[in-house]
Regions:
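Active-site histidine-anchored catalytic micro-motif
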Residues: 1-153
Length: 153
């Protein structure tokens, strides 16, 4: 299983410094390392076209993301995971769905409600959900993996 992980910023790639969230170069790779430590059954390639909190996202960032993805042979991957902030996740998802319409590889966006080093974070669960979706061959297109809360069954 070969998956391209594209880091773009957002809370999922941040650390808290006092009362402020700041993008962190080490934090984002914590996702892939945590996954490999726990499951170890995926070959990850990584890319990082930019790092920005999603409330600061502009059109040029979306174009840069598309250019980054188009620079890879996407059909050589089983899937693509894009880490992103929650504030503009829906815009980037729609943009990618238009740009990559017809791609035979799933693109799954993931984000987090808190930084990964916060015990309340859903970031790792969202990442695992994305990988599980790709492994299951559940479909092609653009998707979002996001767990809101523990709901009663």
């Amino acid at each position: 299983m070969k998956i391209l992980v594209v880091f773009t910023g957002g809370t999922i790639g941040c650390v808290r410094k006092g009362e402020v969230l700041s993008p962190d170069n080490e934090q984002k790779y914590m996702l892939t390392q945590m996954y490999l430590d726990r499951y170890g059954d995926v070959d990850f390639d990584t890319a990082e076209p930019y790092t920005v909190l999603s409330e600061n996202l502009e059109g040029c960032h979306m174009n840069r993301l598309a250019d980054c993805l188009q620079s890879y042979d996407l059909n050589s991957y089983d899937g693509i995971v894009v880490t992103h902030g929650t504030d503009t996740l829906q815009y980037t998802s729609a943009f990618l769905a238009y740009i990559f319409d017809g791609l035979n590889v799933p693109i799954v966006l993931v984000s987090a409600n808190y930084p990964l080093d916060d015990s309340r974070s859903n970031g790792f669960e969202n990442f695992v959900g994305a990988i599980d979706f790709i492994k299951a061959g559940s479909g092609n297109g653009v998707f979002v993996s996001y767990k809101n809360a523990d709901l009663p069954v």
